Structure formats: C-alpha cells, structure tokens
UniProtKB/Swiss-Prot annotation:
GO terms for cellular component: cytoplasm. GO terms for molecular function: leucyl-tRNA--protein transferase activity. Functions in the N-end rule pathway of protein degradation where it conjugates Leu, Phe and, less efficiently, Met from aminoacyl-tRNAs to the N-termini of proteins containing an N-terminal arginine or lysine. Pfam families: Leu_Phe_trans. InterPro entries: Acyl_CoA_acyltransferase (IPR016181), Leu/Phe-tRNA_Trfase (IPR004616), Leu/Phe-tRNA_Trfase_C (IPR042203), Leu/Phe-tRNA_Trfase_N (IPR042221). It catalyses: N-terminal L-lysyl-[protein] + L-leucyl-tRNA(Leu) = N-terminal L-leucyl-L-lysyl-[protein] + tRNA(Leu) + H(+); N-terminal L-arginyl-[protein] + L-leucyl-tRNA(Leu) = N-terminal L-leucyl-L-arginyl-[protein] + tRNA(Leu) + H(+); L-phenylalanyl-tRNA(Phe) + an N-terminal L-alpha-aminoacyl-[protein] = an N-terminal L-phenylalanyl-L-alpha-aminoacyl-[protein] + tRNA(Phe). Its EC number is 2.3.2.6. It is found in: Cytoplasm. It comes from the Bacteria. GO terms for biological process: protein catabolic process. SUPFAM superfamilies: Acyl-CoA N-acyltransferases (Nat). This is Leucyl/phenylalanyl-tRNA--protein transferase.
C-alpha cells in the first residue's frame, strides 16, 4: 500500500483500512479525532489503538506484526509457581480502576516518558464506567494491616476481545500475578488470547509472541463474536491457581 498518513474526520468515527498503516513508523495509521468512548470502541473493534506522547498529535496504530499472548502458553516457570503457592497478595477485579491507571502512568520503570496523559486517563475511566475498560489489582497487606496497591494492569474489552494497555508493579512479581489472573479469568470463558499490542521483554518472558496482523485480525474478529456473561466483569476477588 502507498505510504499515506490519514487525518481523521472529527465528525466521523470511520478509520482507514488497517492495511493502509505505515511501515515506518510501523503501524501508524491516522492522526486526529478524539478519545470519545464511541471512537475508542470503534478503534479497538478494528484492531486499532491510540498511542502518543505529550505535545504529539493524537495518533492511531495497527502494527504489523502484533504482539499477543496465547493464554495456554502463558509462561509460569518454577520460580513463579513457587511464588504463587506462597503468595502474600490479594488479587481483585475492577476494584480500583482509577488508581491502577494513575500508577501505570507514573510507573518508575518508564524511561521514555509516560504516554498515559491525563486526557487518556479520563477517557479510559469513562470507558470503565461504561463497562468497556477493566483493571486487575494486586494488593499487599503488611504486618500492621496497612493495605496497598502494589501491582496491576488495565485494558479494553469488546465482547470476547481484550486488549491490554498498561501495567505496573511496586513489588516483585506483582504485575506477573495480575497478568496470570487476567489470563485465567479469560480462559474460564474460553477466550484464548490477550492482545498485547507491542512486544517488550517483560511480555516476551511471560510467553507473548509476535504474529502477523492478518492472523491477529482473524483471531480478534472471532473473539468479537463471543458473548460474555452479564456478571463477568463484576468487581470481585480473583484466585490465581
């Protein structure tokens, strides 16, 4: 395809075909638009996500290849299994979405500047309130009964498709526990993969791999046909096994 960068129409939710995304930078598809819930849901339903930094225009991406985790291949090595068996953590679903996004935005391991800007936090909070964005929280209670959020992740779900957005940790293995809990939760209703968008060393260590955009879209479109139980995303405590 020709290397054309599209400008979104503010009055339309239509995106260009994902095959039109640039090869350099990989996956950049369009500029502009807004972070309204309707546009975000339209984007995620087509395998497109926003990603930009402060002072940049709003940019929309659909990279090729795409990073995913096949849940059956989620990697739990012997050391991590021992940590799970002796876990001091409590893991919950959708109990503090706002704090998870704030801590992801300010995670100390970010070295290239945060991309979770205040307007993005607000947009995803609105999606959460509408039932499309969800969080996993990992809590630790110390010997003085002080409870703190020490790890977590959040992402966007449209029917059976879940796209992970960001995660953080303050204690060893906390973000791994969150990812495993998410995988086991999705697997319980026969959802077999998590969209990771872009590969990084942490995700690769947990079993993520890159796949072609065509294969990703095929898997995604199948996931979008799945109907979720009405109470699936209700706030509750989760157990990692």
């Amino acid at each position: 395809m020709g290397q054309i960068l599209y400008q979104l129409d503010d009055n339309s939710l239509t995106f260009p075909l994902i095959e039109c995304a640039l090869t350099e930078p990989n996956g950049l598809l369009a500029l502009g638009g807004d972070l309204s819930p309707e546009r975000l849901i339209a984007a995620y339903s087509q395998g497109i996500f926003p990603w930009y930094s402060d002072n940049d225009p709003l940019m929309w991406w659909s990279p090729n290849p795409r990073a995913i985790i096949d849940i059956d291949q989620l990697r739990i090595n012997r050391t991590l299994r021992k940590a799970i068996n002796k876990s001091p953590y409590q893991i919950t679903l959708n109990q503090d979405f706002s704090q998870v996004t704030q801590l992801c935005a300010n995670a100390p391991f970010r070295t290239d500047g945060t991309w979770i800007l205040p307007e993005m936090e607000a947009a995803y909070l609105t999606l959460h309130q509408q039932g499309y964005a969800h969080s996993i929280e990992v809590w630790y209670t110390d010997e003085h009964d002080n409870k703190a959020l020490v790890g977590g992740l959040y992402g966007v779900a449209v029917n059976g498709f879940f796209s992970g957005e960001s995660m953080f940790y303050k204690q060893s293995n906390a973000s791994k526990f969150a990812l495993i809990a998410l995988g086991q939760l999705l697997k319980s209703v026969d959802i077999n993969f998590i969209d990771c968008q872009l590969l990084n060393p942490f995700l690769e260590d947990m079993g993520a791999k890159e796949t072609s955009r065509d294969i990703f879209i095929h898997k995604q479109q199948h996931a979008l046909t799945k109907t979720m139980p009405d109470d699936f995303w209700q706030p509750r405590t989760l157990t990692v096994i």
